[in-house]
């Protein structure tokens, strides 16, 4: 059986403050952002190979 990671979620205080690090220092791209009011978060999606990093900020 082959296991793979679909995504990794990382809680941040501010997406606006942290996205620069992920883009500029790590060279990742932001595929999109989304507010998810039912979960109380704003999420940014950053593809990482076959997986993705999800940065989550509380609303």
Where are these regions (language model features)?
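Core segments of cupin and vicinal oxygen chelate
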Residues: 2, 10-52
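Intrinsic, low-complexity N-terminal interaction/targeting segments
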Residues: 54-59
């Amino acid at each position: 059986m082959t296991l793979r990671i679909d995504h990794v979620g990382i809680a941040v205080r501010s997406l606006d403050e942290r996205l620069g690090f992920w883009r500029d220092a790590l060279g990742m791209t932001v595929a999109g952002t989304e507010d998810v009011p039912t979960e109380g978060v704003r999420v940014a999606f950053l593809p990482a190979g076959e997986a993705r990093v999800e940065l989550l900020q509380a609303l």
